[in-house]
Amino acid sequence: MPSGSSAALALAAAPAPLPQPPPPPPPPPPPLPPPSGGPELEGDGLLLRERLAALGLDDPSPAEPGAPALRAPAAAAQGQARRAAELSPEERAPPGRPGAPEAAELELEEDEEEGEEAELDGDLLEEEELEEAEEEDRSSLLLLSPPAATASQTQQIPGGSLGSVLLPAARFDAREAAAAAAAAGVLYGGDDAQGMMAAMLSHAYGPGGCGAAAAALNGEQAALLRRKSVNTTECVPVPSSEHVAEIVGRQGCKIKALRAKTNTYIKTPVRGEEPIFVVTGRKEDVAMAKREILSAAEHFSMIRASRNKNGPALGGLSCSPNLPGQTTVQVRVPYRVVGLVVGPKGATIKRIQQQTHTYIVTPSRDKEPVFEVTGMPENVDRAREEIEMHIAMRTGNYIELNEENDFHYNGTDVSFEGGTLGSAWLSSNPVPPSRARMISNYRNDSSSSLGSGSTDSYFGSNRLADFSPTSPFSTGNFWFGDTLPSVGSEDLAVDSPAFDSLPTSAQTIWTPFEPVNPLSGFGSDPSGNMKTQRRGSQPSTPRLSPTFPESIEHPLARRVRSDPPSTGNHVGLPIYIPAFSNGTNSYSSSNGGSTSSSPPESRRKHDCVICFENEVIAALVPCGHNLFCMECANKICEKRTPSCPVCQTAVTQAIQIHS
């Protein structure tokens, strides 16, 4: 018995390696012949059939995935019972041994136990095979091909349409990468019209040949992008830091526009570094940016060269003019009004240049506030007057030439000195029809608050000011010329910032006159005592020719008149001229070299420009000019067409100023 039991155990243990899973994908098992049709199985063949029956592999008919596991116990029991009935005791016994019923019973028991173990093993094997099949399906490389292509390893897409397939990185080895490269070759260069396409995930481009596949797919595109994205850097030097500031512009506006235009990055030099721009970008863009920078630098160099040529020479004297007949004068203004004269974006100074046909160089921030005006002498004088009048109108800073006049404080009166100025005043040349000028403005001292210039540029064309200190308009002295310009009502009605031309008539004014103040001779009294009539109309005893109109107004009074000129008497207005000094209402020093002195505090108190009695306490709305007392302001508003005497703007009301 022991020997029979050990033999039965050996037979049972012999087919133990059979339940191992087949390599994926598992080959279909060959169909087993039915028990009745085939020959009788003996020994190991019978046990193999029993094991296959236990696994449910003996049924060639298609079944559901879970059916073999469900029918495995019943099939195993039926097979064992049938075979036990068919086999004789001799067949169940091992060869060469006598029949042993106990061994047969032990063998049946062991077969039942092995059947149960096989059932469990079959379930586990089936689950493992399903999981492996799913993994194989997921990790396999899918090649999309037209329906005509038949391959056992390809998956057909209905209709031959190409779709996007996402593959995981698992099990994506070099062999599959090579297959993908081959598929790409078919797609981009094959004879098939529809082609094949391999789809791979980006994270699958890892080790195992995937990098080579990606390079094969995108090699040409990457090379093209590299050729297009090659950048170059070039340094563009400019002459000076001033050129850098000009090219960069205010708050970098110009350099930003250049960057956008050329599609480059331009690094600007900082203060203290060499004036070199560093341009980075494509080669053609860098070349265009370099041309733009060098062109702007050359343009600025030309402008600066012209400024240096026309600018002031050493010693503060005027430079020689560019062309024959041209001259350059300097107009000094306070620091605080430089921007006012220049205007927003240079609009004011450009307008003055266009109106006067001159070239005006504005002062830089680190230099004296002196405007350099170049042009013909008469145009230069017009431009100077425009600048002065613009400051006067915008700031309201006037100086009254009354008994405490400018010459009394600044020393010698230039109009009574010998030399060029005196000869100009005493010349017998006729007065040309020209713009009005103030002779007191032109002092040849470097400390002049109105600038300095050459004397011949002022009087080279025999031009005389018509409201100079000795003009009949000053109402305090007499005229030294042979002729007097005739002023009519049509001339007074013109409202212009620059004083209009006055027609000339041959009317002599050497008639008897009564000077208010005695004259002690030319040059003997350095300070001519100029008296200005404070109130009332023309003096009772005329100091001018009787043919001169009684209704004459001062030319500057045209800016502050309120009524049209008529034949009646008008209120005599004193001479008001702007003060261009820093903090003091004084004029420049005279030719004698004496320094300017500040007027007393009483000079700083402004009186009404209409009545000259009351203090200025009213302003007109909407223009805002505060040059009137409340009584005169109300009179202006009560007129039929109320308008500001200064700017001729329509007035709606007058308001009182509390200061």
Curated annotation (Swiss-Prot):
Biased composition (Acidic residues): 104-137
Biased composition regions of type Pro residues, renumbered to the chain: 16-37
Low complexity bias locations: 1-15, 64-82
Lineage: Eukaryota, Metazoa, Chordata, Craniata, Vertebrata
Catalytic activity: S-ubiquitinyl-[E2 ubiquitin-conjugating enzyme]-L-cysteine + [acceptor protein]-L-lysine = [E2 ubiquitin-conjugating enzyme]-L-cysteine + N(6)-ubiquitinyl-[acceptor protein]-L-lysine
Variant or mutagenesis effect after changing G343D: Prevents RNA binding
Protein name from the UniProt record: RNA-binding E3 ubiquitin-protein ligase MEX3C
UniProt biased composition (Polar residues): 526-544
